[in-house]
């Protein structure tokens, strides 16, 4: 199975390659979110338990229970989430767990080509948790007129390569990277209740990026 979700370490390296400081106090992150609608929380800086298990997880080199605990134990106590899982059978398990944590609105996603996010190449199975109610959704890129080429096109590389790709996305470059980003950004717009129609949310993401 494939997992396209980079670890927090890889995300950190990309942001550092862009000369973006990630070492902020919680109050600074709160201010950034209020001012810019965006904040990056590097997990080891805020979640002491995960900080100490990180080296052990790296040595094991395989998926463990910690791959599932992470999204369920966020110290930020957010009420809206988009969560990717690495197996389809985990969708409802996560939905029930998040419901027990009083999450208001969440999408739990797993694509049929093995990604733990919404795929531009294959259908993605989604369990929606909203106000204690669980429902099933399928996202089909063909219905969105997405003509993505092949999975290998979104495989990352070193931090500089990934940072350059990220910059190109924000410059409006139309490729499989940007399609994947817009699909998953659309999920964020849904759980934040900016949109209730996924196609409209996706088109908004595309228009926003294309506008520069």
Regions found by a protein language model. Give the residues of each.
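N-terminal glycine-rich flavin-associated loop
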Residues: 13
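Single conserved hydrophobic/aromatic residue that forms the stacking wall/gate
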Residues: 1-6, 10
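Glycine-rich anion-binding loops and their surrounding alpha/beta cores
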Residues: 16-23, 28-212
